[in-house]
Design a protein with these regions (language model features):
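Hydrophobic helical h-region of N-terminal Sec-dependent signal peptides
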Residues: 12-18
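Compositionally biased intrinsically disordered regions enriched in Thr/Gly
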Residues: 25-246
């Protein structure tokens, strides 16, 4: 797998600093905004168990065992982001529902598993990267399904940075084409045509550049997710931002 050459990348600081200023704003306002001194917190995350009414909930169609872990960062907006994500994904785990009698035949599996773990991966100036690792096993299934989502925060502006904010307007398809060329051998080996490849909304900043992550089975019927790096891609042509050094 190829990766982007360091000389072709926008520094991480630069990308994150200007993300919040995307749009039609006067240059003068942009200059004064970047000149402002912003206190960037140092993230120190502690893994904690999420408090839910019960670890195992039984309904008529079976029981589900929950294992939920998050992080405490002393940044309320970050901590709330992950809790709210879990509440949306697993509403039954947070609802104080009384157990019901399971109506599944005794000779059939009735216990499902669901786990979500949040982990802090690292910080580079105003960029903080986390990972949400999920695993679900439906009762009676041949195997469970796992997924890892990377979450990137701009600490100076207190916001989650999505791919739609990261990629310049009208450049999504051109970036897709460049990604395909950079990873063409692997993609062709798995019979994946250019029009089937999309710029993933799951990404992280690697040592040498941005890496787009594709979950299980999205690109091919295989047990490993695929990491699609942009090689020989001039990222400044696609990614929002201008270089700015930390002072």
């Amino acid at each position: 797998m190829k990766i982007v050459k360091r000389s072709q990348l926008i520094p991480l600081i630069s990308i994150l600093t200007v993300i919040a200023m995307v749009g039609c704003q006067p240059k003068k306002e942009q200059s004064s905004a970047t000149a402002e001194k912003v206190d960037i917190p140092l993230i120190q995350a502690k893994v904690v168990a999420v408090k839910i009414p019960k670890q195992k909930l039984c309904l008529e169609d079976g029981c589900t065992s929950y294992d939920l872990q998050t992080v405490e960062t002393k940044q309320k907006w970050i901590d709330e982001y992950f809790i709210n994500r879990m509440k949306k994904a697993e509403p039954n785990a947070f609802a104080n529902i009384a157990d019901q009698k399971v109506k599944v035949p005794a000779d059939e599996p009735s216990l499902s598993e669901s786990s979500t773990y949040v982990r802090f991966l690292g910080q580079n100036y105003n960029l903080a990267t986390f990972a949400i690792q999920t695993y679900s096993y439906p009762a009676g299934a041949a195997h469970g399904m796992s997924h890892q989502e990377f979450v990137n925060f701009d600490l100076s502006n207190k916001k989650h940075i999505t791919v739609s904010e990261l990629v310049k307007p009208d450049m999504n398809q051109k970036l897709r084409d460049e990604l395909y060329v950079s990873n063409q051998n692997w993609l062709e080996d798995h019979n994946i045509k250019k029009e089937q490849l999309q710029v993933s909304d799951n990404y992280y900043y690697g040592v040498n550049g941005i890496v787009f992550v594709y979950p299980l089975y999205e690109l091919a019927s295989m047990e490993l997710s695929y990491y699609c790096s942009s090689a020989d891609v001039e990222e400044s042509a696609f990614i929002v931002g201008q270089p700015r050094s930390e002072e």
